[in-house]
Amino acid sequence: MLAIAGPRQRGGAFCDGVSRRDVLRVGTLAALGTTGGWSLPTLLKAEAATGGPRPKSVIMIYLVGGPPHQDMFDLKPDAPREIAGPWRPIATNVPGFQICEAFPRLAGCADKLTVIRSIIGNQADHDAVQVFNGRDPRRPKPSGGWPQFGTVVSRLEGAARLESPPFVSLCYQCTHGPYNEPGPGFLGMAHSPLRPLGDSRRDLVLNGVTLDRLADRMTLMRSLDTLRRDIDTTGMMAGYDASTEQAMGLLTSSRVADALDLSREDPRIVERYGTGDPKVMIDSNGAPRVPQSLLVARRLVEAGVRVVTLNYSKWDWHGGVNVEGRANNSIFVREAEEFPIFDRCVSALVEDLHERGLADDCAVVVWGEFGRTPKISPIVGRDHWPQVNCALMFGGTMRHGQVIGATDRIAGEAVARPVTFGEVYATLFHHLGIDVQRTTVDDLHGRPQHLVEGQAKPIAELVG
């Protein structure tokens, strides 16, 4: 949620004597319907003073359930049939860089992509925690739990623009609990993401309520909260206050609401990404297959959001009969359905970011919680495989057009340049200008905690 002031405020006063801290304070007052003696021209001048380079941002796309790395980005055509499967690799526009034949659009923009084929340290069970915060859920955690990446960014950086939250989640709630993103951990509710999906989107517009009425309601709420604040020792009230201020800011601004409204987008761009039904949860317990979420994510970072997370479809293809009683549930049938849509929407995001001049400012990572077994099962599926995983990255002034790492002849083990989840997140923090070697956040007991696990450093092949 919106964190107006934090320990990492940068810079001092602007040339007109208005400090950045004052600018942020003014934004809060404006969102609450009170200006503290500041005139409207001064408010507008103060907001204009925050202009400059577009804020850096990250989009994190979670492929729910664990995608099959050896059928997507690490094909082994010379392996036995029971390992290689039916897919064949195709050349990309980068010499020596091959991917699945079902991804012709991605092949055409591979010079803008990086595939990491050697992610290690995965767990064997479904748990989205590691995807969202880079932490091994099997290891001890501090009181309150580890915060996810966007929560940490919210705490350290706050909002990039006065009326935009630092962190938005476009993740759909899955009925299978382990597929869902974790909470804010020990950083608390004040830094939880804005979750605009479903009925809550109606809260992003005024619906006829005037700013004066909003200000009156806010005054009453703050008066009633005084007593509760005096006796509250859990920190939840601070989170509530921050959430309320966030909501007030959004209610008085259309920027985020407009970003979520695809009717305002060029229909040709919407068509390029494709659309899906958000009410259809894949296999009943996964996320919906909604390519338009990637477009909404682009619109949100363009509106000033620092971190956008989203979950996409379901990739846990064990074969056999699925939870909906679907008999023809072969992994290769599912891939034939899923891969073309994935190719279309991800390549659309790649090209869209470049065409709109956002590619250097927005880094994207696409991954799941683990890989899949090299050997195809008797019921024509691939099971969980924690030994190795893969990720697709693009954007963010990184050196793309490359493959990092390698696996053995059956895509079962990393044999070159193993990469950890922590290294990927160190790279994303680096993109945002946050030094993971020097920066910490305090837990509930006041102990400084490092941002990534195992003293991981940014991936040198990308940023070094």
Residue ranges of predicted features:
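Ligand-binding pockets and gating/stacking loops
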Residues: 1-464
